[in-house]
């Protein structure tokens, strides 16, 4: 069976909106499919990201300047030196949870400035 994609596209360009609507309905019935996007799945994921107001700052790697990263983590979290070192050594680990976007970006910038790898969740 010969399939001429360009001819089909040309025909679609010339068709009216109502003809295209009828075509979509016929294809849905013939192949038992739906042209509607999976709104419940895709909408939930996209809506969650757009409406997110609290973030978790995750240290993924301390990099080569581990001592500097420990000092920054200690200052940010208020942990003692031993606990801050354990947090950095245990990377990937959460540095701070449930923080606003601005604060999360500030923390990320401070950690990246001393060579750490950071992600926001």
UniProtKB/Swiss-Prot annotation:
Gene3D superfamilies to which the protein is assigned, alphabetical: 3.30.1390.10, Single helix bin
One Gene Ontology term from the biological process aspect of the record: translation
Magnesium listed as a keyword: no
Protein origin, superkingdom: Bacteria
Assigned keywords, A-Z: Ribonucleoprotein, Ribosomal protein
Pfam families per the UniProt record, alphabetical: Ribosomal_L12, Ribosomal_L12_N
GO molecular function: mRNA binding; structural constituent of ribosome
Gene Ontology, cellular component aspect: cytosolic large ribosomal subunit
Heme found in the keyword field: no
HAMAP family: Ribosomal_bL12 (MF_00368)
NCBIfam families: L12
Family the UniProt entry places it in: Belongs to the bacterial ribosomal protein bL12 family.
Subunit structure: Homodimer. Part of the ribosomal stalk of the 50S ribosomal subunit. Forms a multimeric L10(L12)X complex, where L10 forms an elongated spine to which 2 to 4 L12 dimers bind in a sequential fashion. Binds GTP-bound translation factors.
Known function: Forms part of the ribosomal stalk which helps the ribosome interact with GTP-bound translation factors. Is thus essential for accurate translation.
Protein name according to UniProt: Large ribosomal subunit protein bL12
Organism of this sequence: Limosilactobacillus fermentum (strain NBRC 3956 / LMG 18251) (Lactobacillus fermentum)
The organism's taxonomic lineage, starting at the top: Bacteria, Bacillati, Bacillota, Bacilli, Lactobacillales
Gene encoding the protein: rplL
């Amino acid at each position: 069976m010969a399939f001429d994609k360009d001819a089909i596209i040309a025909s679609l360009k010339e068709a009216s909106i109502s003809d295209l609507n009828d075509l979509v309905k016929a294809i849905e019935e013939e192949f038992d499919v739906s042209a509607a996007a999976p709104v419940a799945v895709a909408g939930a994921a996209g809506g969650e990201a757009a409406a997110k107001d609290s973030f978790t700052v995750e240290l993924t790697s301390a990099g080569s300047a581990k001592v500097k990263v420990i000092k920054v983590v200690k200052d940010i979290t208020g942990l003692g030196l031993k606990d801050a070192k354990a947090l950095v050594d245990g990377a990937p680990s959460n540095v701070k949870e449930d923080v606003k976007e601005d604060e999360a970006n500030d923390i990320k910038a401070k950690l990246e400035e001393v060579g750490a790898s950071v992600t926001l969740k």
